[in-house]
Amino acid sequence: MKHVDIFTDGACSGNPGPGGWGAVLRYGETEKELSGGEADTTNNRMELLAAISALNALKSPCEVDLYTDSAYVKDGITKWIFGWKKKGWKTADNKPVKNVELWQALEAAQERHKVTLHWVKGHAGHPENERADELARKGMEPFKRR
């Protein structure tokens, strides 16, 4: 099984507002960069889309170390999702889970891979995370109102 490192980030101008996501995928010496955005979104949606898009870009099952500066993404997929599913995608206080379609897409995207999630402090000089942030801002650009 190939080993791939993935670094993701999301950005939003206003929250909600125009947003973007970025991802850097590294397999050995090979790197691939992905980015995209939406006109009206939130930072959490962009963080989720970065991870989903990166995992879906992998052509075969891989062992993945996924680095995110989003505690929301890390805690959601490693802790909260199990309870949400048990309760029919409801939170502890019985409210519908926000961004449920993205959580379901992230769960599906990681199913064929062996994913280990890592939280990194954002904007702390981590080169690949800084690059993912640049890509997220680039992905947001076309949607910003001038």
Swiss-Prot record:
Residues 123-146 are annotated as: Disordered. Belongs to the RNase H family. Pfam families: RNase_H (PF00075). Endonuclease that specifically degrades the RNA of RNA-DNA hybrids. Mg(2+) 2 binds at D9, D133. Its cofactor is Mg(2+). GO terms for biological process: DNA replication, removal of RNA primer. PANTHER family: RIBONUCLEASE H1 (PTHR10642:SF26). Residues 125-146 have a biased composition (Basic and acidic residues). Its EC number is 3.1.26.4. Keywords: Cytoplasm, Endonuclease, Hydrolase, Magnesium, Metal-binding, Nuclease. It is found in: Cytoplasm. GO terms for molecular function: magnesium ion binding; nucleic acid binding; RNA-DNA hybrid ribonuclease activity. Disulfide bonds: none annotated. InterPro entries: RNase_H, RNaseH-like_sf, RNaseH_domain, RNaseH_sf, RNaseHI. This is Ribonuclease H. It catalyses: Endonucleolytic cleavage to 5'-phosphomonoester. Monomer. Binds 1 Mg(2+) ion per subunit. May bind a second metal ion at a regulatory site, or after substrate binding. The keyword Protease does not apply. The keyword Translocase does not apply. Mg(2+) 1 binds at D9, E47, D69. It is an enzyme of class 3 (hydrolase).
